[in-house]
Amino acid sequence: MYSHPSAKVDIVLVHGLNGDPQRTWTAKSPNGNGAFWPVDLLPKSLEAENAHANVLVYGYNADVSSKKHGTGPSSNYIHQHAQTLVTFLTTYRKSRKTTRNPIIWVAHSLGGILVKRALEHSDSVRVADHEDYRSIYVSTYGIIFLGTPHDGSELASWGSALQGMAGHVPRKFFDSEPVLIETLRKDNETLDNININFLNIYQRFKIHMVHENQKTDLKGTKSLIVDAKSAAPRLPGVTSYGVEADVSNY
C-alpha cells in the first residue's frame, strides 16, 4: 500500500468483522473526503520522527451479512484465514527483500484474533521447505489490538452491532451463524485454544490492547460491543488502555 526505499520496519493493518481494507482505515470527515490514514497520515507521522516503514493493508472476506464484496458470507474458518495471511505476507516480504524487517501489527476487532492465530501458525512451521513462513513469527516485534474480543462477545451484541451498522442481518443469522461469528462467541472452543496457545508466545512481543470507552448506537440503544475485560485482559507486560471511541471509530 505504501512503501519506502529505506524502510526498516513493516507495519501490517488487519481489519475486523464485516470490515474491508479501505473503509475500516478511512477517517470520516464532514465534507465526505475521508483520510485513508495508512497512506495519508501514518507515513507523514513516521517521517516526522525520521522513521521509515512499509505500510501494508491486508484484506480478507470477513463478511457475515451481505454480498458487498461480490461473495457471500465467509465460509472459511479462522485457521484458513490465518494460513492465507502468513502466505501472503511471506510472499510480499520475499518479493521486496524485506524478510529481515521487524513487523508491527495493527489489528481491529476480529483482525486481532486472526493475527494471533497467524502467529501461532507461523511459529508451528518446522518443515524445511517452509522455513520462510516461520519468519513472520520471528520478525514480529509488536502488536496493537483495537477492540479485539480476546475473551469473546455475546452473540446478541454482535448481531445488534451488525444490524445497527449494516442496516440488516440475515433472517437466519441466529439459526445458522457464520463461522467467523461463531469464533467470537464466549466460551468458543476455537477461541479458547487460540488464547491458550498465544499465552505461550505473547511475551516476546510488545503488545498494546485498546478498548472502547464509548457505547455504540444500535438503533436507539447504546451498548459496549466489546467490554474492557474482553478487549484488554490483564497480562504481565501488556499495556492496556481505553480511548474515547466506539467499536467502529478507533
Residue ranges, per PLM feature:
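Serine-dependent carboxylesterase/thioesterase catalytic core
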Residues: 15, 65, 79-195
